[in-house]
């Protein structure tokens, strides 16, 4: 027997038993975002490697350790996208979407990072991202946070997530702070692990995000970034907090929140849950006002967020919020000469008469017992039975698979009866 081929480690199939919950999540996300007037954009999953090196940062873990990079047959270095913002910015610049007008966009799809697979973290994972270009006020920052808060309510998980905010200021604000932070870290060099020692010289703000408890202990005495913010950054963050207060959205200011990608400035935020065991981020974002110019476009303010769909699916499963629409409403059972085609015609009539109805025909033969067993297995609530007599009389037997009652109807009126049952 030939050796079976397995999926790549950390890249999972979404099976028929799982896809209804995914569809429910994706549809809810799309409906919430669309309610704010945002438009979908679809980008390739493969980009030039240089795009991510320039946008995300050479020294970030994503670029230095986690990207799937390869040379194509022309010798060009290409990368499976590890995140969506850089590709969205590239698309907007290339297609002149932000030269004269603001843009409010969203996208959804697979991303790739070569990480150690674990619960809620995979090598192929799915994100939904929302990006706004051309608006620089705290009002649009607040709208994005309000959008995510609405999504949590729609999904029923709003009591299981909490919001953390920070302002990391402008590039100029951070320059003096970096100097002060590095000086502090050098005084505690013996406590730092190798990762933080490296970050101290490449991106010292990332040390604030360490999970090492020994280093976390000394960071309580570290210089505070808020004390180095300029007046514009302070006013922007105060305006955001005021808008969130007015909207009734609770939050915590976490001065160690910096996010893991180099392009952020001013506002950064994360939605965090403890429902998955260890504390985990389900959504994060912030401002990246310099990224468009950095990638060759005109200076353009921008803000956005991304959410991990696998983690949201895990939350829904953990919290037992998995009610989804059944995949089959009506199962058509047939037996006898000429009944198969009659059953297929009736199914087509029902699909036209009842918007969204899901009708499955039985194929493969078998007696009524076998066919009803299959109807139960696929979760149908109604079975339609067609024998030779029913075909001759243009009737059909409708059986309620929940209550057990059955009755014979003219085929012309059965759609109305089914619509009342499902």
Curated annotation (Swiss-Prot):
EC number in record: 6.1.1.21
Pfam families (alphabetical): HGTP_anticodon (PF03129), tRNA-synt_His (PF13393)
Keywords per UniProt: Aminoacyl-tRNA synthetase, ATP-binding, Cytoplasm, Ligase, Nucleotide-binding, Protein biosynthesis
CDD domains: HisRS-like_core, HisRS_anticodon
Major localization class: cytoplasm
GO cellular component, as recorded: cytoplasm
Location of this chain's protein in the cell: Cytoplasm
Catalysed reaction, written as an equation: tRNA(His) + L-histidine + ATP = L-histidyl-tRNA(His) + AMP + diphosphate + H(+)
Gene Ontology biological process terms, A to Z: histidyl-tRNA aminoacylation
Keyword Amino-acid biosynthesis attributed: no
Coiled-coil regions, chain positions: none
GO-annotated molecular function: ATP binding; histidine-tRNA ligase activity
SUPFAM superfamilies: Class II aaRS ABD-related (SSF52954), Class II aaRS and biotin synthetases (SSF55681)
Claim: Cell wall biogenesis/degradation is one of the keywords in the record: no
Source superkingdom: Bacteria
PANTHER family assigned to the protein according to its UniProt record, in alphabetical order: HISTIDINE--TRNA LIGASE, MITOCHONDRIAL-RELATED, HISTIDYL-TRNA SYNTHETASE
Family (UniProt): Belongs to the class-II aminoacyl-tRNA synthetase family.
Subunit structure: Homodimer.
Protein name: Histidine--tRNA ligase
Organism: Vibrio parahaemolyticus serotype O3:K6 (strain RIMD 2210633)
Gene that this sequence comes from: hisS
């Amino acid at each position: 027997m030939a050796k079976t081929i397995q999926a790549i480690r950390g890249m999972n199939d979404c099976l028929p038993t799982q896809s209804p919950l995914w569809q429910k999540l994706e549809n809810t996300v799309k409906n919430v975002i669309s309610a704010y007037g945002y438009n979908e954009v679809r980008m390739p999953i493969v980009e030039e490697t240089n795009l991510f090196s320039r946008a995300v940062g050479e020294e970030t873990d994503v670029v230095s350790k986690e990207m799937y990079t390869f040379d194509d047959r022309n010798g060009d270095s290409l990368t499976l996208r590890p995140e969506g913002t850089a590709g969205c910015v590239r698309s907007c610049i290339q297609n002149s979407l932000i030269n004269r007008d603001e843009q409010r966009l969203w996208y959804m799809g697979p991303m790739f990072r070569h990480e150690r697979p674990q619960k809620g973290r995979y090598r192929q994972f799915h994100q939904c991202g929302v990006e706004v270009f051309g608006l620089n006020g705290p009002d649009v920052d607040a709208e994005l946070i309000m959008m995510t808060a609405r999504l949590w309510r729609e999904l029923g998980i709003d009591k299981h997530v909490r919001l953390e905010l920070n302002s990391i200021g402008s590039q100029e604000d951070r320059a003096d702070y970096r100097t002060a932070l590095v000086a502090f870290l050098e005084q505690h060099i013996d406590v730092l692990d190798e990762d933080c020692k490296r970050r101290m010289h490449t991106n010292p703000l990332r040390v604030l995000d360490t999970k090492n408890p020994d280093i976390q202990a000394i960071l309580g005495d570290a210089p505070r970034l808020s004390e180095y913010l300029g007046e514009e950054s302070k006013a922007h963050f105060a305006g955001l907090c005021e808008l969130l207060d007015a909207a009734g959205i609770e939050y915590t200011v976490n001065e160690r929140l910096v996010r893991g990608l180099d392009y952020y400035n001013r506002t950064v935020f994360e939605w965090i849950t403890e429902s998955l065991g260890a504390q985990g981020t389900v959504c994060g974002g912030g401002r990246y006002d310099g990224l468009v110019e950095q990638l060759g476009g005109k200076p353009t303010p921008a803000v956005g967020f991304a959410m991990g769909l696998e983690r949201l699916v895990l939350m829904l499963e953990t919290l037992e919020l998995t009610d989804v629409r059944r995949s089959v409403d009506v199962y058509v059972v047939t037996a006898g000469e000429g009944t198969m085609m009659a059953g297929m015609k009736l199914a087509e009539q029902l699909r036209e008469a009842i918007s969204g109805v899901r009708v499955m025909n039985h194929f493969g033969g078998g007696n009524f017992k076998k066919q009803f067993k299959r109807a139960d297995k696929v979760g149908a609530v109604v079975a339609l039975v067609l024998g030779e007599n029913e075909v001759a009389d243009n009737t059909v037997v409708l059986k309620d698979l929940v209550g057990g009652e059955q009755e014979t109807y003219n085929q012309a009126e059965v759609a109305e009866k089914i619509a009342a049952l499902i």
